[in-house]
Each structure stands twice: as C-alpha cells, then as structure tokens.
Amino acid sequence: MMYKELCGEKISRLGMGNMRLPTIDGRNGPIDEAKAQEIIDYLMAAGVNYYDTAYMYHGGKSEIFVGKALSKYPRDRYFLADKMPSYPLEEGRTPQEIFEEQLKKCGTDHFDFYLLHNLCEDSVPVFTDPKKGVIPYLLEQKKNGRIRHFGLSSHAKPETLKAFLDQYDFFEFVQLQLNYLDWEMQDAKQQYEIVTNYGVPVWVMEPCRGGRLASLTPEADKLLTDCDPGRSVASWAFRYVMSLPNVGVILSGMTQMDQAENNVETFSEGKYLTGQEQKVLNQALEQFRSQVIVPCTACHYCDGCPMELEIPDILKLYNRYSLSKSPMIHMDVAELAHGPADCIGCGACASKCPQHIAIPEIMAKFAEGLKTLPKPKMNP
C-alpha cells in the first residue's frame, strides 16, 4: 500500500469513502452491513487507514455504520474523517449540536480529520455567518483535541474557493472533485492550482466520477486496454490523480469487493502514468468526450424533487441514450416511477447541483428525444 506523509501523519494514498456503501433492496434501502463490513475488513488488512463519512450520507446512517465497523480495531490504527454540513445550520441547528451528534454516532471522542462540507456559493454565507459561529466553534474543538486536522471539501467555483482561502489561512487540506474528465470540463485544474499555491495538500473525491470512468465507450476502453491489457479502465482514473504531485489521499466509494480488490492492487503497485500512457489516456478521453455526456456523479444533492423524480437515475439513462440511441431505453424509462416528461422545470434541483448541470433542460431534451426514438420490437 502506498503511503504519504500528510499533515504530520503517515496516511494511505487510498481512502475509503462511505457515501456509496452496498445496500439491501436498491440504493434507498438500508446499508448491507455484512458486505460493507467485509469490504472495510479487507481494506484494513491491506493497509488502508483513512475512512471518510458525512452527516448526510445514507440518510444519516453512514456515520453510525462506519463507527460501528471500525470499533473492532484499535483507535490509533485508522484515521476517521467527518464533515460539518450547511443545511442543518440553515435550519437553525447549532454547530455544537451537530458536532456532538456526529461524535456520538461515530462512537468516538475525536475526529482525526474534519471538514467544512461542500463549500459552494450557497454555503459560504452559512459557514461565515458570525451569528452561527461555525468556524470559531470548530477551531475551538481543534484546540481542545477533538479535531486533529481541519480542512474543507469544495464544489465551489474557482474564484469562490480562492477568495475563501485568502480570507482563512488555517486550513490544513482541501478536498476537491478531481479526475481526468473534470480537469478541464469542471475547472478542476484551476482549483488544484489554487490549493497548491495556497500551500496545502489536495484530497481527491470522485476520482472515478461516481463510477462513470470505470467504463467509457467501447472505443475508448479499447485504447486503454490495448495499451495495458492487465489493467482495468478504472485503474487509469486512479493512476491519473495519483500522479499529480500535490495529491494526498484519494477517496473511493466501494460497493463491491472486486472494486476494493482492484483499488488495492492499483495502490499497492503505485505506478504513476508514463508520458506515453498519458498520451493514450488523452486519446481515450477525446473519444469519450466526443459523445454527449452529462457530468452527473450521483451525489444525490438534488434529492427532494417535488415530482419525485430520481434525477441521477434519469441522467444516467440520458447518458446511455446519448451514447447509443438504443430503443431499449424505453424499457428502462418505463421502470421508473416518474420519467423525464414529468419534470415541471421548477429548477430546484439545478440550484443544488455541485456540477452545475442544467437539469430541467436535460429532462426536456430527453423527453423530446424519447418521442422520436423507435420503440423496441418485442418477440411475439
């Protein structure tokens, strides 16, 4: 396992994100604790020592599970990371109430790493509101040893991130959405450079973009597998961010054991991309981007649609539709409780989207496209 000295700690380059744990009966079902525990046990045995959770993951159940799953191990064998959410603060809860609840749910007396969650244009006023006192409270907890290292995760625009870091000079690390697709498309390069110039390491979230970079298009996949038949397509995404000099921890959400095994293999070999491999990856990316892709990561920040649309599921289908125009998409859409045609265009989802996707416009385009897409021919 690869390790790196970060914030004075020896941390595994691979960290486990706990936003997409295996579940029972679909995404909205309860966490499959037996499978999730098996994955954590495997990662612990492989030397992974960084585990990330958050208040909102799995409807508030991720923190409870992670605390329980790690409780079988000595507390000094792993680093536990959690985050301060902005939404409950907007609703009137205090940072103290939230922080104390998180400690209790995780069954710990301190967090090794603690972050402001989802810095963005909407959350900056909440985190910096002097009446709420979020940052002073968390700095006090750090002084008292209940937070060992203080950082932030960001989906903000580059100018917002820079202004925030210019104002506050005490953050020890910054977590960014970083992958080879977003390097240009979502200004990840500019954000990476801002944090690097600030002088602190970058933690990576969405290195495989919610699994989207685990398989590109058949043509793009072939470019990568022909270059190195022994590697998975997903491993290229991890090796890309691993090769960036200021990247520290790289988080991966692992819902299946084979994903964990593949990641451990990648991070045990620790092979950075060569110049030739980077050229091949650029060719594969160009082929992939030539298709119509909506950059959804299935983070579910858009949950709560007034028409009860499962927006990430629909956007996933839209990408499949865009890539193939297969009549079978009709069957997949029919399985949804509510389809793209049910969108009323209110825009509530778009205002929450960290990827700044124009969701109502995509829904309208998808619904219109389905009207002209031939229905599948069924055998008699």
Where does each model-flagged region fall?
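A general structural detector for well-ordered alpha-helical segments in enzyme core domains, enriched
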Residues: 2, 35, 39, 62-69, ...
